[in-house]
Amino acid sequence: MKYVFPTDQTTRYRFPTHANLLVMDRAEATASESFITVMEPGEAPPLHVHHDTEQVFFVLSGQGRLITGADEQDQGPIGPGDLVRIPPGTWHKVPCVGDEALRYLVVDVFPGGRPTAEPTWESHVRVVCEGNGWDFDAVKR
């Protein structure tokens, strides 16, 4: 069983809107996964929701804004040292608004246990790519 996951030994997934650096695959845990999200200035993932996931972000560097709800309510700025919690079922996105990359460590927690339909990080990324019309092979490079 693995207990330590070095953040300098990640697998990079470059989506058209941001990059995720996989630190700990959900397959290696009972009910969680972890990755570092990186967005360049002006980038933002699309507004999205996780029905089975609570997300916790710790901002490492850069500046962003927390947007929540289907009506895109601005919850204000986030920056280094801030901890953000996104409850299950909450629509959200975090655009990078500064002039440097926004980097934050994400811990996804699955209150009901690891999702059986997407038991690995890669299976989840394939679903995300399909839902957004992105090429999985291009994302995983």
List PLM regions with ranges.
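A short, N-terminal "cap"/entry segment at the start of jelly-roll beta-barrel domains
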Residues: 1-33, 46, 119-141
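A generic "binding-loop/recognition-motif" signal
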Residues: 19, 43, 52-53, 71, ...
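Histidine-centered metal-chelating micro-motifs
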Residues: 44-46, 65, 84, 88-94
